[in-house]
Design a protein with these regions (language model features):
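Exposed, flexible binding/inhibitory loops of compact, secreted disulfide-stabilized domains
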Residues: 1-93
């Protein structure tokens, strides 16, 4: 991941955020879910597809399973998907 993108994610990670980043021949699609009270979260990509007029990206934040021991530390879950550079807009669903 490019350093500039890492810096941008670090600056935004406390709040829910969605962004794209272009570098050379790559498109990075990013969704951050903000501050969570514990660890144990995962992110599932529900959809990533190119339609006629846009790239669609849908993700879900999945919390810790009930009864699972989780760390009591703050976490900032986010996902970065790298794909080929495209000119279409990204629609976050």
């Amino acid at each position: 991941m490019p350093e500039e993108l890492k810096t941008e994610i670090e600056a935004r990670k406390a709040e829910d955020f969605k962004m794209t980043y272009l570098l050379d021949d790559a498109l990075y699609i990013v969704h951050g879910f903000g501050m969570q009270e514990t660890g144990g979260y995962s992110i599932q990509v529900q959809a990533l597809y190119l339609a006629e007029n846009a790239i669609y990206f849908e993700t879900d934040l999945i919390g810790p399973v009930n009864g699972t021991k989780v760390e009591k530390c703050v976490s900032y879950p986010y996902i970065v998907v790298k794909t080929e550079r495209l000119t279409e807009n990204v629609v976050f669903e």
